[in-house]
Amino acid sequence: MPELPEVENVKNTLNRLVGGKTIKEVNVLWSNIIKHPELDEFKIRLSGQTIQHVERRGKFLKIFLDDDVLVSHLRMEGKYALNQKEEPIDKHTHVLFEFTDGSELRYRDVRKFGTMHLYPIGEEEQQPPLSKLGYEPFSAELTPAFLKKMFSKTGRSVKAVLLDQSLIAGLGNIYVDEILFASGIHPEQKASGLSLHRLKRLQENMVSILKESVEKGGSTIRSYVNSEGRSGNFQLELFVYGKKGEPCKKCGREIARIVVAGRGTHFCSSCQK
């Protein structure tokens, strides 16, 4: 699933590709993707509106138009690409936004898990799914002291807490494993037991790793590409994620894989305590 760095790169490429384009017509080939409003209203409201800009919130895209905001979640395999109307339509393309200049923004999703919600500007943050999201990882409010207070309310592992989108929005399996490795924290460690010193390292590594990944285009583990069709490069920098059985780059011990919070989890038993 695309995480914060990947969605940030999709956001940046969409701004370059479709900012300022006016929607002529919307064609939906798989209606289950449209969660709000009803399909006919979704298509009618979007027609005639111009894309102003695109933002990111957690793992969601917020496509701002004249009057509405299209909230899009890519889930496992969702992708956007700009095509010309006359180009063949891939069988996994499910939503097409035709623009007045003859180009089309196409949403492709092999798994069909992606979602789209349309709300009037200003209402999107008060409605699901955005209303359920926690703090952005880059938020100045996420100080070590604030994290200590947040984590003290739970008996869960630090990995489970970092994956909880209602607390911190945008992290997923890849970056939680990498952040915990960089911080020397075992993924099964109780979040409530972490000291301020360890939380400071965690917060600093969270910010630095996410920023570096954004700069390097995100991580292409399986099929991720941005909206210009480019793969990411941060997968080349990973220390533990997907490295089961390989020697740790820091100490040489074999990287282990366990299941934490229902997710496959990679870590070094020597470097992480």
Regions found by a protein language model. Name each.
Residues 1-273:
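Structured catalytic/nucleic-acid-binding cores of DNA maintenance enzymes
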